[in-house]
């Protein structure tokens, strides 16, 4: 459960090689990616938290989908079609990743379709200061060649700013195995 009492759902996608990806509807997040190395040993290569509570106060947005606008907007100000908008300043003097209540810190609606999970949310006109209602989908596909693909789809009713991404971090030697500088 989130601090607001919303249910967190975990999904697991497995393929024929035994690899698996775990996702959660909190932040449309990748929480685990278990893959075989070149000797066939399985390791979780996605950096994340063992318990959902770790994601509630994670400034790095580990594994989560961020937006409305990934990255910074200088001084929390932007102009769209000649109109100036003021956004929350949440990173020094700048607006970062859509504000403190950005998409990474929300429950997404979710459904399973074959070997994919589709997560969606609606950001109302004026949400976090942005113009236009924005309907977003994040589609997570995982195939038998161990390819994980995230497709973001966005639809709006006004000209607006949208820049979605995922903040998953990897250690190809496996989580907890030390520095990433020795990857081969």
Question: In which residue ranges do the predicted regions lie?
Answer:
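An exposed, glycine/acidic-rich loop-and-rim segment of catalytic or binding clefts
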Residues: 1-184
């Amino acid at each position: 459960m989130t601090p607001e009492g919303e249910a967190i759902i975990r999904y697991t996608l497995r393929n024929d090689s035994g690899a698996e990806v775990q996702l959660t509807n909190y932040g449309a997040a990748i929480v685990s990616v278990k893959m075989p190395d070149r000797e066939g040993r399985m390791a979780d290569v996605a950096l994340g938290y063992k318990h959902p509570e770790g994601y509630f106060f994670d400034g790095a947005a580990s594994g989560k989908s961020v937006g409305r606008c990934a990255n910074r907007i200088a001084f929390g100000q932007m102009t769209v079609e000649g109109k100036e908008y003021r956004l929350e300043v949440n990173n020094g003097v700048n607006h970062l990743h859509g504000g403190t209540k950005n998409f990474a810190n929300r429950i997404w609606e979710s459904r399973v379709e074959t070997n994919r999970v589709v997560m969606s949310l609606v950001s109302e006109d004026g949400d976090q200061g942005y113009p236009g209602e924005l309907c977003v989908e994040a589609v997570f596909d995982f195939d038998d060649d161990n390819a994980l693909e995230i497709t973001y789809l966005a639809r709006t009713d006004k000209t607006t700013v949208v820049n979605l991404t995922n903040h998953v971090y990897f250690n190809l030697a496996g989580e907890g195995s030390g520095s990433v500088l020795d990857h081969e």
